[in-house]
């Protein structure tokens, strides 16, 4: 409905359709809308499909001046309900896929624009929803202006849709994440008043660059909002729907506007294509697994066989450092259960310490995955990796690990594959285990140091571990404990 009506509106600026043709289109669209009004079930209440369906009905009602009929009142009521239950308090769509979140936002913006064009007041729930999703887009936007390829998402520029949010709401903070002027795409979407007023909206940058979207479990650690800024996205939230992937404890890393560590994308929805499940699995994300077992499992294109339960996240952001941690219960079913936990300490502007902690009492094999952007070349040097792109990053570990590099495929755009690399590390250990990974653009030295009690007794690494990082002329001591500190 929406595309038909938008096409008609464009042509009607310079062309008059004959009555017979217009009647034919109306009958066809009405027949479709009658079905959309009648077919509405639990799936559509929760799915992005339902939002698209109701927005099409509302657009139909506006164009044909049917706002006093069920074609308008029923879908508007349904849409209000959908916005309340599909959009989390932090502005993220519950299906955990930015691509589909923004399909929903596109349609909601279309409805709001129709309200303006037809001199109706935009309902408050629409403004709230546009604001919530717009701000979550601003939080997730990389220095390259693209969304992370979370779930079933492509490498898509977010500036145009954020620009439309800013224009409709007259929001200067959202404008800072969009274009300074209305872009070509948005000219076709917005009403004339919003386009005219956009230059007068003052641009306001957020006070703090790092942002926590707590309800969805998405955290964004930054040193600035500039194109040459540093960015880390950490994910530890619900899997969402069939669009969700096994990305618990995953992180993206972008240094000076260049992608280094990424989500591998989606590629296809074809049931029998093995790449579909391959890109949904744990190893296509920068996370950890235990004993070669996947913490979440999938079947065919849409089936979720098992989904690990995420635990509550904790974060602390300030001007000097950012910290975030998360965990999940995906390995409680092992004969000897394990609780994986990841802690990320970002010492601004350009040092990242990744702590992978595994609480258990038995012996297990622990594996880390690091999936690289297709423009990054990795090289193994002793117990470290050099990542080479336009910039260079050094990755080093506190322990001697088995490190290998594998050829993989990633997908930045639907139906397209790119060749890339995956770094895999393996570590066999008994009891509570901590693996520390340090990443910096400057070469550095890392060494384990002893942890002792007040009586000078040595503390076992199963209980606590510390490292010393020598960087430039500085020494950084980093400590992690797997047990509660007591008076022993």
Residue ranges and their predicted role:
Residues 239, 248, 262-280:
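Extended active-site and interfacial segments that coordinate phosphate-rich ligands
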Residues 222-223, 235-238, 264, 292, ...:
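Pocket-edge structural micro-motifs
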Residues 35, 102, 131-144, 381, ...:
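Short, conserved secondary-structure transition motifs
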Residues 1-131, 141:
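Aromatic-lined, polymer-binding surfaces characteristic
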Residues 47, 154, 160, 171-181, ...:
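CBM-like, beta-strand-rich accessory domains located in the C-terminal region of large
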Residues 66-70, 81, 117, 121, ...:
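Secondary-structure boundary elements
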Residues 229-232, 242-244, 261-263, 270-272, ...:
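Short helix/loop capping segments that flank catalytic or ligand/cofactor-binding pockets
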């Amino acid at each position: 409905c929406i595309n038909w009506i938008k096409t008609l509106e464009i042509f009607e600026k310079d062309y008059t359709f004959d009555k017979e043709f217009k009647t034919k289109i109306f009958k066809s669209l009405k027949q479709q809308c009658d079905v959309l009004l009648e077919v509405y079930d639990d799936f559509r209440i929760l799915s992005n499909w339902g939002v698209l369906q109701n927005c099409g009905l509302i657009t139909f009602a506006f164009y044909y001046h049917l706002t006093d009929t069920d074609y308008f009142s029923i879908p508007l009521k349904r849409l209000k309900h959908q916005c309340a239950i599909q959009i989390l308090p932090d502005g993220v769509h519950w299906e955990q896929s930015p691509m589909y979140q923004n399909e929903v936002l596109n349609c909601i913006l279309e409805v709001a624009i129709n309200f303006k064009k037809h001199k109706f007041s935009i309902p408050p729930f629409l403004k709230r929803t546009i604001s919530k999703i717009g701000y979550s887009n601003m939080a997730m936007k990389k220095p390259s202006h693209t969304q992370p390829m979370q779930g079933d998402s492509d490498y898509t520029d977010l500036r145009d849709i954020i620009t439309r949010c800013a224009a409709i709401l007259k929001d200067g903070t959202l404008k800072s994440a969009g274009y300074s002027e209305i872009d070509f795409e948005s000219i076709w979407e917005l009403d004339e008043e919003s386009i005219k007023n956009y230059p007068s909206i003052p641009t306001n940058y957020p006070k703090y660059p790092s942002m926590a979207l707590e309800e969805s479990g998405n955290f964004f650690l930054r040193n600035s909002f500039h194109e040459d800024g540093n960015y880390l996205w950490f994910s530890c939230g619900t899997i969402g729907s069939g669009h969700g992937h096994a990305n618990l404890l995953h992180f993206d890393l972008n240094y000076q506007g260049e992608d280094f560590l990424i989500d591998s994308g989606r590629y296809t929805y074809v049931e029998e294509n093995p790449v579909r499940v391959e890109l949904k699995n744990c190893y296509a994300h920068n996370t950890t697994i235990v004993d070669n077992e996947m913490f979440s499992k999938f079947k065919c294109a849409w089936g979720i066989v098992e989904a690990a339960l995420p635990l509550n996240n904790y974060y602390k952001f300030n001007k000097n450092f950012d910290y975030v941690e998360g965990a999940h219960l995906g390995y409680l079913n092992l004969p000897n259960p394990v609780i994986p936990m990841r802690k990320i300490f970002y010492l601004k502007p350009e040092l990242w310490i990744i702590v992978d902690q595994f609480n258990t009492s038995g012996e297990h094999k622990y594996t880390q995955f690091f999936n690289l952007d297709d423009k990054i070349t990795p090289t193994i040097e002793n117990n470290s990796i050099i990542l080479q792109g336009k910039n260079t990053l050094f990755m080093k570990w506190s322990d001697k690990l088995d490190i290998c590099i594998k050829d993989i495929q990633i997908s930045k755009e639907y139906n397209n594959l790119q060749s890339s690399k995956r770094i895999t590390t393996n570590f066999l250990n008994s009891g509570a285990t901590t693996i520390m990974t340090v990443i910096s653009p400057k070469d550095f030295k890392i060494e384990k140091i002893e942890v002792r009690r007040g009586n000078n007794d040595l503390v076992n690494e199963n209980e606590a571990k510390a490292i010393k990082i020598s960087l430039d002329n500085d020494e950084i001591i980093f400590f992690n404990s797997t047990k509660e500190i007591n008076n022993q």
